């Protein structure tokens, strides 16, 4: 089957979104309404080295319809359209009856040009926006401050010793390295000091001391799991984790703004994630999954999530490196919301890209990857389900498509027919999004843009188009360098000409003065 017949064109977009139409309607092609023939592109070009491809290729880049200049101009147009949409909606949110008629007219005109003439009434009838969705997992009000006498008795137990609260963590670490403190006593003192410094910057040093003790303890104690659980649960209580929410999938709610965030809660939560990174190695699977759940929920928390992204990515490297199958098989229990999935996936570090695809596949499809042909069938089936169930819920659809973007891998495109099949399914989903201005909300425009961009990314990454683009870019670079050299050369020559002129002018003035003096003497 010819790809150009199957993937004929994207649907016509409205006046406010010309992302694909601008590309397809270019004068650089004779077939204006067709995408490039995917089946005619040679997949082996991907395996060639870039230099070898450039050496062997003798095609004329001017005839290549999807050229870099066209893409650049399209991206610029798309960016300006997106800004116009957002500006219109921002103005709309500030619009009320107290404003002057002139301001109302201006806003109506702006919305009419940017997102459709009837969108004003639609937005007024649905005043709740996605930004109102919130999730709270840690809070000052639920933080349980332990009774220090009880905690001291729990930590020190039967050890008859005086507890020195002023001991410095570096000094204590030196004592540990020299093995001058028995392990039981060292663990008791270090645990108590860790709890006391949870909201302090010295907490990281006490966590490092705990790690030293655990490595020594691992081979000499059978109750290490109990010790780890005690420290984990006590710390979770101190940062105010809602234990009832730990047992159910994350559900975003429309609630009012939460209480003011105390400054030390942010530090406590960051130190809690650092502590989980240390405890994870010495925990059983039950505690490990609770740590993973807590880390994901803290990331989604509206109060503290934005402060903890880096620490979250550092923690998640542990389950990915130590037992990835355990993580992948349980990650779907955290939430059923595609919006939560995208937040988690986008916060993983770059070193986890391989496993991020596996995690995304599990979340998107609902089951683990088998690394065989059934994975492709599962992706296609899920895309068909999304296409059939799209019911004007554009926000959910947007995050589903973004999750698919994380899940899809080059191993799924063993043949051109597979690539053609996935692109056709994306086009089908795009067609299900109504083009009526009555439903032309910002979320609808965003999901169409996301589908179009993903379509182009899949096309370029899985055909020989990527080397073609590289060749075009590289062919432009020398010209740019020559222009720069010419610019500096002209600038230098202009400066030298100015210097010569000024020098000549000074010489003339000097000669005139000399003649005047000689005439005066005479």
Swiss-Prot record:
Biased composition (Basic and acidic residues): 482-492
InterPro entries, sorted: DNA_repair_Nse5/Nse6
Gene Ontology terms: cellular component: nucleus; Smc5-Smc6 complex
Disulfide bonds: none
Function: Acts in a DNA repair pathway for removal of UV-induced DNA damage that is distinct from classical nucleotide excision repair and in repair of ionizing radiation damage. Functions in homologous recombination repair of DNA double strand breaks and in recovery of stalled replication forks. May prevent formation of excessive Holliday junctions or assist in their resolution.
Name of one Pfam family that matches: Nse5
Protein name: Non-structural maintenance of chromosome element 6
Entry keyword Cytoplasm: no
Record's subunit section: Component of the smc5/smc6 complex which consists of two subcomplexes, smc5-smc6-nse2 and nse1-nse2-nse4. Interacts with nse5.
One Gene Ontology term of the molecular function aspect: chromatin-protein adaptor activity
Subcellular localization, as worded in the UniProt entry: Nucleus; Chromosome
Keywords: Chromosome, DNA damage, DNA recombination, DNA repair, Nucleus
Bias-annotated ranges (Basic residues): 504-522
Sequence segments annotated as region (Disordered): 482-522
A biological process from GO: DNA damage response
């Amino acid at each position: 089957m010819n790809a150009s017949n199957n993937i004929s064109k994207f649907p016509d977009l409205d006046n406010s979104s010309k992302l694909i139409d601008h590309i397809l309607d270019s004068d650089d092609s004779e077939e204006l309404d067709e995408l490039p023939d995917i089946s005619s592109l040679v997949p082996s070009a991907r395996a060639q080295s870039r230099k070898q491809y450039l050496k062997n290729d003798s095609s004329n880049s001017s005839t290549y319809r999807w050229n870099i200049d066209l893409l650049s101009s399209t991206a610029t147009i798309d960016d300006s359209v997106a800004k116009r949409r957002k500006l219109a909606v921002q103005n709309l949110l500030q619009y009320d009856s107290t404003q002057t008629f002139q301001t109302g007219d201006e806003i109506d005109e702006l919305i009419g040009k940017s997102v459709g003439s009837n969108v004003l009434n639609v937005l007024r009838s649905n005043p709740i926006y996605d930004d109102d969705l919130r999730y709270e997992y840690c809070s000052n009000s639920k933080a349980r401050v332990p009774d220090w006498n009880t905690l001291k008795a729990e930590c020190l137990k039967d050890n008859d010793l005086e507890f020195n609260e002023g001991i410095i963590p570096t000094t204590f670490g030196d004592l540990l390295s020299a093995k001058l403190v028995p392990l039981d006593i060292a663990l008791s003192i270090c645990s108590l000091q860790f709890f006391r410094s949870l909201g302090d910057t010295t907490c990281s040093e006490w966590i490092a001391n705990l790690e030293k003790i655990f490595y020594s303890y691992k081979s000499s104690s059978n109750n290490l799991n109990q010790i780890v659980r005690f420290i984990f649960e006590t710390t979770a209580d101190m940062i105010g984790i809602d234990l009832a929410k730990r047992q159910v999938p994350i559900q975003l709610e429309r609630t009012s703004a939460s209480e003011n965030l105390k400054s030390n809660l942010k530090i406590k939560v960051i130190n809690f994630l650092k502590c989980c990174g240390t405890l994870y190695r010495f925990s059983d699977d039950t505690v490990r999954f609770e740590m993973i759940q807590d880390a994901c929920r803290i990331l989604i928390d509206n109060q503290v999530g934005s402060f903890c992204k880096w620490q979250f990515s550092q923690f998640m490297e542990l389950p990915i490196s130590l037992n990835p199958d355990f993580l992948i098989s349980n990650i779907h229990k955290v939430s059923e919301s595609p919006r939560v999935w995208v937040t988690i996936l986008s916060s993983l570090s770059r070193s986890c890209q391989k496993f991020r695809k596996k995690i995304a596949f599990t979340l998107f499809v609902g089951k683990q990857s088998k690394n065989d042909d059934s994975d492709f069938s599962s992706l296609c089936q899920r895309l068909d389900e999304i296409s059939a169930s799209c019911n004007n819920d554009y926000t959910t659809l947007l995050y589903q498509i973004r999750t698919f973007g994380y899940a899809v891998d080059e191993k799924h495109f063993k043949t051109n027919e597979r690539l053609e099949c996935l692109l056709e399914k994306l086009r089908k989903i795009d067609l299900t999004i109504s083009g009526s201005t009555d439903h032309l909300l910002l979320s609808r425009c965003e999901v169409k843009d996301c589908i179009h961009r993903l379509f182009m990314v899949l096309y370029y990454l899985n055909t020989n188009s990527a080397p073609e683009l590289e060749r075009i870019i590289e062919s432009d670079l020398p010209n740019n360098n020559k222009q720069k050299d010419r610019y500096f050369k002209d600038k230098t020559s202009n400066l030298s000409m100015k210097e010569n002129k000024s020098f000549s002018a000074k010489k003339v003035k000097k000669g005139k003065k000399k003649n005047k003096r000689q005439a005066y003497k005479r």
